[in-house]
Each structure stands twice: as structure tokens, then as C-alpha cells.
């Protein structure tokens, strides 16, 4: 990382590892609040760790999940939509509580393979096209 000019990331990772060892033994915490208390951990990273490491139902709010949600429900998506409570509430309500890890992986795959950002989405191959507002209007 240092040759890439990312020395600050090395320092963050070091500080984070040190705090994890001091505060939690050697176990990465499973509680979102504990993760957020660590240096360099954002809301998204904390949610991703809870979901992918611990299979806890945490929403992943990013441009991809917001784009899919906007298209599904026919909502206008703006740069600020990631911070919009309406999108957060919808994304949270849709999480599969029994298999949140699989659900979030599927959502990210959908965003990268079918519900594309810069190209027209591939609605014909979309598993949710029958109830997607965007697909019905295209």
C-alpha cells in the first residue's frame, strides 16, 4: 500500500488491529457499534462485516443497492439517495432475515451483472422483472 501513496491506510489497519487485540482479544467484533468504534470503519464496512462475516441481517447501503431499490419501486435516485431514510428503510425491510449473507451477495451480483449503471439494464434476464417498476416501463 505504501508505494501506492496509501500509507495512511497502513496506519489505520495497524491501529485497528491493535484496538481489536486490546479490546476484543483476537476476535473481530460482531456488534456493529463495536465495529464503528474502530478507526477507519465506516457504516458500510461495519454492515458488510456483520453481514458477510457473521451472517447478521444488516443492510448494505451503497450506489448499487440504492440503484436497484430505486428502479424496483420507481423512485428517483440522486447522489444523496444513499443518505435518504426512505431508501435505507426499504433496503432494510427487504433483507432476507434467514440468509442475509446470501441475499446481500445476490443483490450485489444483480447490480453488477443485470441492473447495470452505465449501460441499459438487462431486464430480460432479471429475476425481479415481473414486479420491477423500471422493467415494466421499459
What is each PLM-predicted segment?
Residues 1-137:
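Catalytic cores of DNA base-excision repair glycosylases
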Amino acid at each position: 500500500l505504501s508505494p501506492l501513496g496509501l500509507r495512511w491506510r497502513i496506519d489505520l489497519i495497524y491501529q485497528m488491529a491493535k484496538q481489536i487485540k486490546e479490546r476484543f482479544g483476537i476476535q473481530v467484533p460482531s456488534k456493529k457499534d463495536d465495529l464503528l468504534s474502530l478507526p477507519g470503519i465506516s457504516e458500510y464496512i461495519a454492515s458488510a462485516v456483520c453481514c458477510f462475516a457473521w451472517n447478521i441481517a444488516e443492510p448494505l447501503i451503497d450506489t448499487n443497492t440504492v440503484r436497484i431499490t430505486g428502479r424496483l419501486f420507481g423512485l428517483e435516485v440522486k447522489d444523496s439517495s444513499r443518505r435518504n431514510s426512505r431508501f435505507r428503510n426499504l433496503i432494510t425491510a427487504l433483507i432476507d432475515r434467514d440468509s442475509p449473507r446470501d441475499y446481500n451477495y445476490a443483490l450485489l451480483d444483480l447490480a453488477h451483472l443485470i441492473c447495470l449503471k452505465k449501460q441499459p439494464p438487462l431486464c430480460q434476464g432479471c429475476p425481479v422483472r415481473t414486479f420491477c417498476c423500471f422493467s415494466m416501463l421499459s
